[in-house]
Amino acid sequence: MMERDGGTHYIVNEKALPIVLLKTVEAKELLKKGEVVTIHEAVDRVGMSRSAYYKYKDYIFPLYEMNKGKIITMHLILKHLPGILSEVLNQIAESEASVLTINQSIPAHGIANISVALETRQMTINIEELILKMEQIKGVQKINILAQE
């Protein structure tokens, strides 16, 4: 069995996380937004122990915090419609992410596969918000994060 050094990161849907990890994120958000002043207030409000908070606080972050200043590679599946890629790129530009590379397959059966590498350092919104905005574009079928550096 291979030993883990603790440096591996995973993207996990919140539905699969234990409640203590979700409460840790919630407590951190309360502190960050200034809704509470102390850790004691934050953990009381979310209903967790201070020891659990301290145990996990340095190991759980929303995706947008982990991705700030990183290179993100996304895979998009788009319907083959005029202007759809342009709309996606406009959303990226509005977020002030920097497109490092973009690759598009030749559309087959009305579908185009796109991979885009973005540098997120200057983004004005988090990556989750950008994905939500891109998913609202007519013809965007699916968006996946493939990698982050």
UniProtKB/Swiss-Prot annotation:
Residues 73-148 form the ACT domain. Coiled coil: none annotated. Belongs to the UPF0735 family. This is UPF0735 ACT domain-containing protein Amet_0565. The lineage of its organism: Bacteria, Bacillati, Bacillota, Clostridia, Peptostreptococcales.
